[in-house]
């Protein structure tokens, strides 16, 4: 019996040691940079640039309202280990930034990408983001031009921390820039098929202000109040009048912000209610080709073009190839 007990102990000890030294695939032995990110579009762009040369771990679970997200205490461990922390900024993730500042390593930078690329003079304050609140619309990544600028910031940050892979990061940036530019050109082409006067967006949550400004669309309203509560009856009545006056063919909700109110507006006005737009919840599942910034925006743009009476021919032609080096962690 004593021999059997010793053998069992030896097996357990061997397994424990093996677990502690499982090779380069274990997190503890992985010498690559650890990059913490917040919302999934930023996680995806960072992963596209980092490839297999850095570990990318997201913080905000997909399908979560990023404006009201409060990080769980265990996120502090990730932030304390991170070599780089990438956030959108523009007041989107203040609780996460506070947690990062209190737990990060002294030499780890918190990079507010949106704040870097957007001059204060270009801040957009609108329906869900009134100027008196001091929080500009933070949704830059829905404009392919700004997404390219995000990628450039990430490329530069990774290259500074990991100079031996500068050429690799630059090559990945060029590939991303090419994809985002092709997407932009496809939108510009397909929107020409939308009937005159129909390039108007009425949404629940206003995530497309910068996109609309860049492409000549008009955001005529966003139903969600600044405090993310339900809109008042008078606001709904005013919106119904506006939809009728503007002859809006489709109003857009989102999977993250399902809205019974928008359904009611649709019924009252005869406009179609499309509830499947995604603000920062990537389509598909992690590992799927469409589970990416490119997949997200292709889906949203073709949904909007089709909903407004156009034909998304060029958008449908965009191929989304698998990112073979995708290894980012997307909380679900």
Regions found by a protein language model. Name each.
Residues 13-17:
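Hydrophobic core
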């Amino acid at each position: 019996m004593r021999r059997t007990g010793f053998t069992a102990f030896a097996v357990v000890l061997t397994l424990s040691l093996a677990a502690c030294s499982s090779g380069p695939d274990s997190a503890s032995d992985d010498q690559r940079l650890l990059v913490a990110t917040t919302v999934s579009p930023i996680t995806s762009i960072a992963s596209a640039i980092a490839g297999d040369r850095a570990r990318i771990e997201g913080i905000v679970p997909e399908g979560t309202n990023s404006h009201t997200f409060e990080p769980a205490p265990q996120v502090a461990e990730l932030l304390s280990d991170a070599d780089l922390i990438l956030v959108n900024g523009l007041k989107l993730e203040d609780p996460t930034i506070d947690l990062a500042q209190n737990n990060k390593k002294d030499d780890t930078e918190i990079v507010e990408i949106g704040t870097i690329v957007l001059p204060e003079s270009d801040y957009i304050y609108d329906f869900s983001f009134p100027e008196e609140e001091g929080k500009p619309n933070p949704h830059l990544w829905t404009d392919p031009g700004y997404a390219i600028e995000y990628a450039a910031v990430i490329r530069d940050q990774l290259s500074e921390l990991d100079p031996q892979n500068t050429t690799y990061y630059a090559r990945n940036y060029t590939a991303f820039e090419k994809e985002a530019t092709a997407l932009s050109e496809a939108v510009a082409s397909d929107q020409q098929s939308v009937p005159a006067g129909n390039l108007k967006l009425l949404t629940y949550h206003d995530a497309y202000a910068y996109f609309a400004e860049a492409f000549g669309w008009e955001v005529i309203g966003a139903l969600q109040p600044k405090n993310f509560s339900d809109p008042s009856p008078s606001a709904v009545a005013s919106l119904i009048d506006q939809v009728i006056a503007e002859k809006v063919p489709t109003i857009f909700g989102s999977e993250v912000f399902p809205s019974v109110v928008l359904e009611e507006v649709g019924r009252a006005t005869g406009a179609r209610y499309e509830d499947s737009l995604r603000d920062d919840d990537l389509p598909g599942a992690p590992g799927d080709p469409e589970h990416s910034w490119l997949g997200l925006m292709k889906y949203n743009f073709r949904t909007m073009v089709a909903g407004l009476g156009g034909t998304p021919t060029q958008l449908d032609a965009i191929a989304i190839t698998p990112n073979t080096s995708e290894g980012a962690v997307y909380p679900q």
